[in-house]
């Protein structure tokens, strides 16, 4: 296992009381967290959101993406479900880092789309490693989930990592004039899906 469970505490939020669990990667020291709501033990699939870090969307309420909207909606859905997990996957800017994400924004301001901007900076369209999230689920002893995502790459990688996904639950929120091109590019170039998936 590439990471370990380090610490946990109660985390009261606008949506209810979660348990926040901190994880640390063994070789890099990078940290990730999971927010757990309710009882996630048992054989029923657990509603799960893997949310990649987005400082601009999550904390600064940027309209350039749908990340902040997705974060709030996911927390609401999990509490409505009475049980669930949100993994906060700390790979900012599809894992190119915050400063490179700002550089990518500047390229987008000059006409590039989100994929072209990454490539202009020498990165793949998506540099994230979702196997870390599979390891977190295994440390939480969760093997069967319903995943809140529009991203088929997450489904594919988690399935390959022996996480049983029984349903893909779309999370389609936050479209606005500032991010409509970004969302269209995610669909056309990154393969994001906007319909539900049942196994």
Swiss-Prot record:
CDD domains: GTP_cyclohydro2
Pathway listed: Cofactor biosynthesis; riboflavin biosynthesis; 5-amino-6-(D-ribitylamino)uracil from GTP: step 1/4
Keyword line: GTP-binding, Hydrolase, Metal-binding, Nucleotide-binding, Riboflavin biosynthesis, Zinc
Binding positions (Zn(2+)): 54, 65, 67
Pfam families xref list: GTP_cyclohydro2
Annotated catalysed reactions: GTP + 4 H2O = 2,5-diamino-6-hydroxy-4-(5-phosphoribosylamino)-pyrimidine + formate + 2 phosphate + 3 H(+)
Cofactor binding comment, as recorded: Binds 1 zinc ion per subunit.
Required cofactor names: Zn(2+)
Lineage top rank: taxon: Bacteria
SUPFAM superfamilies: RibA-like (SSF142695)
Residues annotated for GTP binding in this entry: 49-53, 70, 92-94, 114, 149, 154
Active site (record annotation): 126 (proton acceptor), 128 (nucleophile)
Any one GO MF annotation of this record: GTP cyclohydrolase II activity
One GO CC term, this protein: cytosol
Keyword hit for Transferase: no
Keyword presence, GTP-binding: yes
Any GO BP annotation: riboflavin biosynthetic process
EC number: 3.5.4.25
PANTHER family: 3,4-DIHYDROXY-2-BUTANONE 4-PHOSPHATE SYNTHASE, GTP CYCLOHYDROLASE II-RELATED
Quaternary state and interactors: Homodimer.
Role: Catalyzes the conversion of GTP to 2,5-diamino-6-ribosylamino-4(3H)-pyrimidinone 5'-phosphate (DARP), formate and pyrophosphate.
The family this protein is said to belong to: Belongs to the GTP cyclohydrolase II family.
Name of this chain's protein: GTP cyclohydrolase-2
Organism of provenance: Blochmanniella pennsylvanica (strain BPEN)
Source species taxonomy: Bacteria, Pseudomonadati, Pseudomonadota, Gammaproteobacteria, Enterobacterales
Gene name, Swiss-Prot/TrEMBL: ribA
